[in-house]
């Protein structure tokens, strides 16, 4: 999934998150969009772009999507990759993302 940055939208206050990979490397990401999917899938989703992302030759930036469930205390839980074969989840994410981009 990519995000075209050749449009106007205000980045008033960026929400940032640090992800740590299996090797312990930290990468800073900007939260592009959160999606409430609890009713349909029992979890929420977040779309991230690297905080210092450079646009490619087409003016696009790579987007990463993850799911998460809230902990019992109301805090956000760990991010989980979305299974590639979960077509219903990916279709919902794409639909919400496309609506977001039209705004």
Swiss-Prot record:
One family name in Pfam for this protein: DUF1292
Domain of life: Bacteria
HAMAP family, per the entry: UPF0473
PANTHER family: UPF0473 PROTEIN CBO2561/CLC_2432, UPF0473 PROTEIN CBO2561_CLC_2432
Entry's family note: Belongs to the UPF0473 family.
Name recorded for this polypeptide: UPF0473 protein SSA_2239
Organism this protein belongs to: Streptococcus sanguinis (strain SK36)
Record lineage: Bacteria, Bacillati, Bacillota, Bacilli, Lactobacillales
């Amino acid at each position: 999934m990519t995000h075209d940055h050749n449009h106007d939208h205000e980045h008033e206050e960026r929400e940032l998150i640090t992800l740590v990979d299996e090797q312990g490397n930290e990468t800073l990401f900007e939260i592009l969009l959160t999606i409430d999917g609890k009713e349909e899938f029992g979890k929420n989703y977040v779309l991230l772009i690297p905080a210092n992302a450079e646009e490619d030759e087409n003016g696009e930036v790579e987007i990463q999507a993850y799911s998460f469930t809230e902990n019992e205390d109301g805090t956000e839980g760990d991010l989980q990759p979305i299974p590639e074969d979960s077509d219903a989840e990916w279709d919902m994410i794409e639909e919400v993302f496309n609506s977001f981009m039209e705004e």
